[in-house]
Every structure is written in C-alpha cells, then in structure tokens.
Amino acid sequence: MLISIDQVLSKTEVRDFRAQLDAAAWEDGAATAGTLAKSVKRNQQITDGSELCQRLGQHILRRLSSTPLFISAALPRTIYPPKFNRYADGGTYGAHVDSALMFLPGSHQQMRTDLSATLFLAEPEEYDGGELEVEGPFGVQAVKLAAGDMVLYPSSSLHRVTPVTRGARVASFFWIESLVPDEGERTLLFDLDQSIQQLTPLVAPDDPRLVQLTGVYHNLLRRWARP
C-alpha cells in the first residue's frame, strides 16, 4: 500500500525549513549507508543528531501526531527521528530495500521498519528527475509530490531515487514501526477506518451500522496489534 498525505507541512513551514536547510552544512550520504547500499547511494544528508536535525524533526513529529490520515494508515508504535537529504548534480540512490531493524539514535533499543516515509521539501518544478520509484505487486510507481506532502510505502519494497539532472531535491525521510506489523492486516484496517470516517457524517452517531463497523474495527485491531 502506497499512500500520499497532503500538506503535512504548510507552504510557510516548508519555506522556513528550506531557509534553514539551505544554509546548513551537508555531508556525504554514503557515510550512513550499509555495505551494499553504499555503492548505489549518491546524495547529501544533514548530520544525524545535529541541533537543526533534531529541531526540525520534532516539528515534523508534532505535525504527524495531528494528521489523522497518517495515524490511520501507519498505526505508529515507534517513529525513527526524521532525517534530511539532498540530491543534486546527478545525485541518485539505486535500487535497495531499507534495513529491517534499526537502533534508535542514542539508545540500545531496536525498532522494526514496517513503513518508510518521504516528506518532500522541494516543489516538483524546482528539479528534474528525483522521482521516488517504488516497486509493488502492480509494477513500479513513480512519486514526485508537492513540497509539504508525504508518501508512505512498505519498507519491504524495492525502491530507488532517479538521478537529479537539474536543481535540488530536498526531503525528510524516516521509518515507522507499526502496531500492526502485517501489511495486509494494516491495509484492511486502513480501508475499514476510512469507510467508517466517510459514513460518520452521513448517519446518526448511534446508527447500528456505524456502531457495528466501529466495533469490528476495534476488535480486529485488538486481535492484530502488538503494542
């Protein structure tokens, strides 16, 4: 399941982010890549753990906590602190799958990566190339969203970023461990929740159909969740 979420950040917030990121020091992204990914990764990143990275990342997390579509789709248990990258001058990231387990920064606690997220911080017309290509059961989906919009996709997906031939592609990226690890179960819960949300304004709060569907949702979540 690949889901686009509009306006996680407003245009004003994006401009503020970019003013700070464009003035920041960037490092070679290959330094943080795994052994296999290092050979196909050509981008820049903001230093992990820097004050800027932490401050902007916390702002993103606050926005996500009040974004119902994100909560419904991800059912987040743990979110890896957002990171920031930049692709320019032919920068690219070849086909790869994200690591299944990651240590949370500054701790010995591991998290499982169920979902990957990219929050775009550059408008599509600012750069050529730079599409996020995600392979799924129905082929390859190319994603290039407006600044402030975000895409969620399974971390198990083979994916790549195509070469940026003009301008710069700036984004935040991070991973989510879901309360419901199984992608199929999580998708069913998302579809059911969205149907409930669409039905809610059309019927009375005590409508038996709405009450029953809501009960089914929570009982399935109770069965499948791993808190």
From Swiss-Prot:
Gene Ontology MF annotations: 2-oxoglutarate-dependent dioxygenase activity; iron ion binding; L-ascorbic acid binding
Co-factor(s): Fe(2+); L-ascorbate
InterPro entries for this protein: Oxoglu/Fe-dep_dioxygenase_dom, PKHD_C, PKHD_hydroxylase, Pro_4_hyd_alph, Pro_4_hyd_alph_FE2OG_OXY
Keywords for this protein: Dioxygenase, Iron, Metal-binding, Oxidoreductase, Vitamin C
Domain Fe2OG dioxygenase, chain residue ranges per copy: 78-178
Transmembrane segments: none
GO biological process: DNA damage response; intracellular iron ion homeostasis
Residues binding 2-oxoglutarate: R169
Residues that hold Fe cation according to the record: H96, D98, H159
Alphabetized Gene3D superfamilies for the sequence: q2cbj1_9rhob like domain, Rabenosyn, Rab binding domain
SUPFAM superfamilies: Clavaminate synthase-like
Cofactor binding mode and count: Binds 1 Fe(2+) ion per subunit.
Enzyme Commission designation: 1.14.11.-
PANTHER family: PKHD-TYPE HYDROXYLASE YBIX
Protein name from the UniProt record: PKHD-type hydroxylase Ajs_0512
